[in-house]
Amino acid sequence: MNENLFAPFMIPVMLGIPITTLIIILPSILFPAPNRLINNRTISIQQWLTKLTSKQLMSVHSPKGQTWSLMLISLFLFIASTNLLGMLPHSFTPTTQLSMNVGMAIPLWAGTVATGFRNKTKMSLAHLLPQGTPTFLIPMLVIIETISLFIQPVALAVRLTANITAGHLLMHLIGETTLVLMSTSLFTAIITFTILALLTILEFRVALIQAYVFTLLVSLYLHDNT
């Protein structure tokens, strides 16, 4: 059994150079641009998925917020495809890296906050102080609300990292256990393999759900600031 449980989460290196960039670019190949007048099945599915995502995420937004629709849809498709590709055996999942998720979360969060302060400065500042707050609690509540505001991108990144990492780690443990049990107890190995198969199906759903949750929270931050 592999003693290093976190070996699958190490960034792959080729000739001493990390190949993370190539892995991140890879999902874009799954969504080709249409180059024909008549769409094929792949393009039709892509357009249907784009319309469905847009309807779910952008229906509550104002016209200013809907200008973010293309970026939010691209974000969802990127995270979802990255998570799904990470389900392939012996593959690397970039979304298990906290640095990458923080790198996605902070610019998006900062963009929504900057949009709010530019378009609705008074309302954005009012979020830092709930209405009807007693005078002696004002300094404390302003500090608390400010801290909670800056924690949002960190929580966004940690949530995605933790859920994807936990799922892959559990699959790795059960898979290693199944291989060990095959030589000692075939019946128990079949049971653990069945559990692994069910967990794999669940992780495919988690991969899509976490992509949707990440994008939805960014959409909610945008809605609060537009």
UniProtKB/Swiss-Prot annotation:
GO terms for biological process: proton motive force-driven ATP synthesis; proton transmembrane transport. Belongs to the ATPase A chain family. Component of the ATP synthase complex composed at least of ATP5F1A/subunit alpha, ATP5F1B/subunit beta, ATP5MC1/subunit c (homooctomer), MT-ATP6/subunit a, MT-ATP8/subunit 8, ATP5ME/subunit e, ATP5MF/subunit f, ATP5MG/subunit g, ATP5MK/subunit k, ATP5MJ/subunit j, ATP5F1C/subunit gamma, ATP5F1D/subunit delta, ATP5F1E/subunit epsilon, ATP5PF/subunit F6, ATP5PB/subunit b, ATP5PD/subunit d, ATP5PO/subunit OSCP. Signal peptide: none annotated. One of its GO terms (molecular function) is proton channel activity. It comes from Balaenoptera musculus. One of its GO terms (cellular component) is proton-transporting ATP synthase complex. Disulfide bonds: none annotated. It catalyses: H(+)(in) = H(+)(out). It comes from the Eukaryota. Subunit a, of the mitochondrial membrane ATP synthase complex (F(1)F(0) ATP synthase or Complex V) that produces ATP from ADP in the presence of a proton gradient across the membrane which is generated by electron transport complexes of the respiratory chain. ATP synthase complex consist of a soluble F(1) head domain - the catalytic core - and a membrane F(1) domain - the membrane proton channel. These two domains are linked by a central stalk rotating inside the F(1) region and a stationary peripheral stalk. The chain crosses the membrane at residues 5-25, 68-88, 97-117, 136-156, 179-199, 201-221. This is ATP synthase F(0) complex subunit a. The keyword Repeat does not apply. It is a multi-pass membrane protein. Keywords: ATP synthesis, CF(0), Hydrogen ion transport, Ion transport, Membrane, Mitochondrion, Mitochondrion inner membrane, Transmembrane, Transmembrane helix, Transport. PROSITE patterns: ATPASE_A. CDD domains: ATP-synt_Fo_a_6. It is found in: Mitochondrion inner membrane.
